[in-house]
A protein has these predicted regions:
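Conserved N-terminal entry element of GNAT/NAT acetyltransferase domains
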Residues: 1-11, 146, 150-153
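Acetyl-CoA-dependent GNAT
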Residues: 7-84, 95-97, 101, 134
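Short hydrophobic/aromatic beta-strand or adjacent loop that forms the aromatic wall/cage
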Residues: 52, 139-145
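Active-site acidic-Proline motif in GNAT/NAT acetyltransferases
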Residues: 82-84, 88, 112-113
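Conserved acetyl-CoA-binding loop-helix of GNAT-fold acetyltransferases
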Residues: 87-100, 119, 123
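Short glycine/proline-centered loop/turn elements that form peptide/ligand docking sites
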Residues: 91, 95, 114-117, 134-140
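Conserved GNAT acetyl-CoA-binding A-motif
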Residues: 101-113
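Conserved acetyl-CoA-binding loop of GNAT-fold acetyltransferases
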Residues: 122-130
Length: 153
């Protein structure tokens, strides 16, 4: 599989929204309070305007994953891989890209029910910070953090 990670283009936001929605709704426990797929493109536009750095993973000419970071706040905000492209190293490559973009460290949150996601993040060196409530929806989330270790990079 030939894959690259690059900045997303505005004409790709609909495709990105579809992958985001499909992946989020299929993760363990689903995605509480996720926007309707028809409005996710608008949410992407607003988020990019507010400071998202939005990257896509492209394999064999097709977008198969997304990574949204907020560099100013050291946050990995969204990381999703299309269900049919999972377990092929794409998520790990996107997470490595986040580690490059946010080299001093970052935090993220994921639903408490997303057990597969928890295992993925822990396998890739992230540590649990705390279980808490999502600041907007109130849904239970687990916060993870990553800091570059002296032996990395």
């Amino acid at each position: 599989m030939n894959m690259e990670i690059r900045l997303a283009q505005p004409d790709e936001y609909e495709t990105i929204a579809a992958i985001w929605y499909e992946s989020a709704t299929q993760m363990d426990g689903g995605a509480p309070a996720l926007d309707d797929p028809s409005t996710l493109s608008d949410r992407i536009i607003r988020s990019v305007e507010k400071g998202w750095c939005l990257n896509v993973a492209v394999a064999d000419g097709h977008i198969v994953g997304l990574l949204a970071t907020i560099p100013e706040d050291s946050i990995l905000d969204q990381l999703f891989v299309a269900p049919e492209a999972q377990c092929q190293g794409i998520g790990a490559a996107l997470l490595d890209k986040a580690k490059q973009q946010l080299a001093t460290g970052f935090t993220l949150r994921t639903p408490v029910t997303n057990v597969a996601g928890h295992r993925f993040y822990e396998r890739h060196g992230l540590r649990v910070i705390q279980d808490t409530a999502h600041p907007i929806t109130g849904a239970p989330v687990r916060r993870f953090g990553w800091r570059q270790q002296a032996t990395e990079g």
